[in-house]
UniProtKB/Swiss-Prot annotation:
Protein's name according to its UniProt entry: DNA gyrase inhibitor YacG
Assembly mode: Interacts with GyrB.
HAMAP family referenced in this protein's UniProt entry, alphabetically: DNA_gyrase_inhibitor_YacG (MF_00649)
Lineage start: Bacteria, Pseudomonadati, Pseudomonadota, Gammaproteobacteria, Alteromonadales
Keyword Zinc carried by entry: yes
GO MF term set: DNA topoisomerase type II (double strand cut, ATP-hydrolyzing) inhibitor activity; zinc ion binding
Cofactor(s) this protein cannot do without: Zn(2+)
Pfam family, one: YacG
Cofactor: how bound: Binds 1 zinc ion.
């Protein structure tokens, strides 16, 4: 028994079985359109930031030497 789903791009009915080459898409064209949407960030998975962006400003993250001054892997002799 096969399942029928809608193509995520154009909503055309697609039979979901082993022979469906582009599942869940109806065609390579729809598959590539979807890929392009992800690549251009038109599609995105929403993520809540773990911290407030204002904290980066308070830490001096925007200063040019932030990473140079806070590198734990570099000792003062290598500068």
């Amino acid at each position: 028994m096969s399942l029928t789903v809608k193509c995520p791009t154009c909503q055309t009915p697609v039979t979901w079985n082993a022979e469906a080459e582009f599942k869940p898409f109806c065609s390579e064209r729809c598959k590539l359109i979807d890929l392009g949407d992800w690549a251009s960030e038109k599609n995105a998975i929403p993520v809540k930031p773990e911290f407030a962006p204002e904290l980066l400003d308070q830490l001096g993250y925007d200063d040019a030497d932030f990473f140079l001054d806070n590198n734990p892997f570099e000792d003062d002799k290598n500068r």
